[in-house]
Amino acid sequence: MFLDKYDYVILDIIQTYKKNNKNELIKLSQLETAFWSRIEHDDAQSTRSAQLGERIANLYLEGYIMNKSNTGYRLTKKGKEELSFQEVEVGL
């Protein structure tokens, strides 16, 4: 699976939320709100081409995120590694 900028936005939102909220997991509604506010000035916002639900499902199926006991989303080890790898590449 090739991850694009919107997938990385989702991974970053999940990781940031967990860090800022004492390891609390992010709920789907909170993830949606944060995602759309983060990309509100992006062209994809107006066309809804970001397709949030499909992206979350694909990230879940590919093992980047998990929904722990239906209480909220968190990154898997694979998701954390991918996000940190992307941050290193962007920093170069």
Range-by-range predicted roles:
Residues 8, 28-29, 53:
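Short amphipathic alpha-helical segments
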Residues 78-92:
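Short, amphipathic alpha-helical interaction segments positioned at domain boundaries
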Residues 21-46:
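Short acidic, hydrophobic short linear motifs in intrinsically disordered regions
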Residues 60-69:
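A short, conserved structural fragment
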Residues 1-25:
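Short alpha-helical segments that sit at the start of domains
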Residues 71-77:
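Minor-groove-contacting beta-hairpin "wing" of winged helix-turn-helix DNA-binding domains
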Residues 43-61:
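Short amphipathic alpha-helical interaction segments
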